[in-house]
Amino acid sequence: KTRILRDSEDFPGLLDTLPEFNQRLCLVGAVLIRYRASFCEKLRQYAAQAHAECSGGREELTLAYKTVKTVTDPLAEQSVIARQLMDHQQSHYAAEIASRLCLSGPHKDDIEVAVNGHSARQYCSQGQVRTAALALKLAEREIHKDTFGEYPVMLLDDVLSELDPLRQE
């Protein structure tokens, strides 16, 4: 899509392909958003438990899948998500043409990690961030076991260096 938007200055006819491209992008994006949100939910369950164990029960880890604002429920039916994505893209259509950049879609999505209700990215210490990262890795390990029936090999380098003694235990 970005290529279409960038090249449209030299080849204005490319913009004629954008509505159909956006429609297909919304259909595929809906599948991706729903899958990611489902995975994030599994990750949240395991990561919260692992984080509680690593922090001695003193902290609560939460995860939230963040997508475009018009998608009210990323676990809704794909047709609902696709319609909401299309609404979002239509509201950004003029801005995308002006900037010649793709401004919305699943490529902009993120997982928000919080410890005790505070954004890990903005408010947590290095030890808390490392604990959250370790909890996420341990959660991925559990999901792998659920999916394939065995634990994966995990190589974790220098995991304990920035953790306080309680977390190291």
What is each stretch, according to the model?
Residues 12-27, 31-155, 161-166:
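Conserved NTPase motor "head" modules and their coupling/switch loops across ABC/AAA+ ATPases, GTPases
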